UniProtKB/Swiss-Prot annotation:
It comes from the Bacteria. Keywords: Ribonucleoprotein, Ribosomal protein, RNA-binding, rRNA-binding. InterPro entries: Ribosomal_bS20 (IPR002583), Ribosomal_bS20_sf (IPR036510). Residues 1-11 have a biased composition (Basic and acidic residues). Belongs to the bacterial ribosomal protein bS20 family. Disulfide bonds: none annotated. Transmembrane segments: none annotated. One of its GO terms (cellular component) is small ribosomal subunit. Residues 12-23 have a biased composition (Basic residues). Binds directly to 16S ribosomal RNA. GO terms for molecular function: small ribosomal subunit rRNA binding; structural constituent of ribosome. This is Small ribosomal subunit protein bS20. Pfam families: Ribosomal_S20p.
Amino acid sequence: MPQHKSAEKRVRQSKRRNARNRVHKAEMKKLVKTVKGLIEKSAEKEEVENAYRAAIQKLDRMAVKGYLHKNNASNKKSKLSKLVNRFSKGDAA
């Protein structure tokens, strides 16, 4: 347990930040899974594109806000783009 007031404050801050990070990362994972699920189900192309756009926006926002490193976000976006492009060409993953 923390022995100093400043250490106690850091514990409180880290708990809040950890909870906030978990919420954002869970939402990001949900959006990515949605895109992958739609591709697996061979859904409408427009539906996949909309889900893809939402996922990309979330990844960009997380990188800007610091919840995710920009290179990590870029890597995830690249992988998603490859999947969506393959799907749109007709070679469903």
